[in-house]
Amino acid sequence: LTQLNFSSEALAFANISNVKDIATRGPITSDHIIRTKPVPVIIAPENPQQSLDDFSAAYEAYFERYTNGTQKCLDTAPRWAVWKGHGTIAFGTDLTESGIVSEITEHTVKAIQFAENLIIEGSSGGWQPVSEKHLFEAEYWELQQAKLKSENVKRGAQKIIPEFQGKIAIVSGAASGIGLACARELFAQGAVVVGLDLNPEISTIFCDSGMLGLLCDVTDQKAVLYAVEEAVRQF
């Protein structure tokens, strides 16, 4: 799941000419690395998939540079992104996870820009995190991984993963009857659910976190397209 940040602050950061350089130097604290990985993916609007593929390959290379042979490479998916010309994106397997990453990203964007504008006597200033080797040691430090595992246990992540966790379900006729029952079951199985209906009360029926109710006539192609776009913006 994703949380898009198209705020003026995120947009300004994404529009910085050297954003790829300053955003990929490292996190503002090594404590963040278990949530954000060392760097974000920089999404090139002309080829988003290639950007993701390049990130995955770069992460594997980073692991190979510093592993002592005893560690197991973590998954190579990014945890946040800078979408050039648009803003930032936080990724997570559920809304709690993506929300944590989104909050960290907001602080990171501000801190990087503050550091870039900071001029210290005898120094050129600029954003300079710790070395990449130190970041690797922090990311793969047993106590860091144990900390993340402990936090996940507290929010129930050690339980059986729901079948539809990380999925987005769109249900038509969702304000009542079979549609509502299906929506509730999908939600119970871990999906975030977008409910569509002609009933104007759909927005109040779907008021829980992880649910979105939209007034929509499914025979209207433009209305359905709008609903899909809203689902993307929300989740």
Model segments located where?
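Glycine-rich flexible loops
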Residues: 1-169, 181
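The beta1-alpha1 cofactor-binding region of Rossmann-like NAD(H)/NADP(H)-dependent oxidoreductases
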Residues: 215-229
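Helix N-cap at the beta1-alpha1 junction of Rossmann-like dinucleotide-binding domains, i.e.
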Residues: 198-202
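Short, conserved active-site loop motifs that form the nucleotide-linked donor/cofactor pocket
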Residues: 210-211
